[in-house]
Amino acid sequence: VSQQPGGPQGVGSTAVGASGADTPVICLPGNPVSVFTTFHMYVAGVLAVMSGLVAPEHGATTPSAITARARVGWDSPRGKTQFIPLCFVDEAGERADDVLSYDRRGGEAWVAPVHPLGSKSHLVASLARARAVGVVPPECEAVTPGQELAVVPLVG
């Protein structure tokens, strides 16, 4: 998977027990931000389907995204999808608790990276402030202030 952060990853199955029944195995990267983004973008939906919380035909393995605007700019790695932890901010750039305040007022959602260094895989302390994961496509080398991007709000 060509993304930042998030590698290496794996998925497969292994025979378990006397019956040899296949048990799914999902391998996550080792760095904290890589695990965080990989789990939210790929694994959470799969677990929801496997546990019966969501029917497979509803496509729950793909998280739902909203459109938000970047309050500030940041660089994105060339040729890789960037998954960047974000917080929602108000018009002045101050952190807001969640996107619902914007939805209730009918305004636009604005976001900013939770850490000034962006989505580096070792920035674990910043994850406590994350309220969403931004999805920057591989052809975008820099996000500019005001640019629209897909954002996956985090639940819980």
Can you say where each PLM-predicted feature lies in the sequence?
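Flexible glycine/proline-rich
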Residues: V1-G156
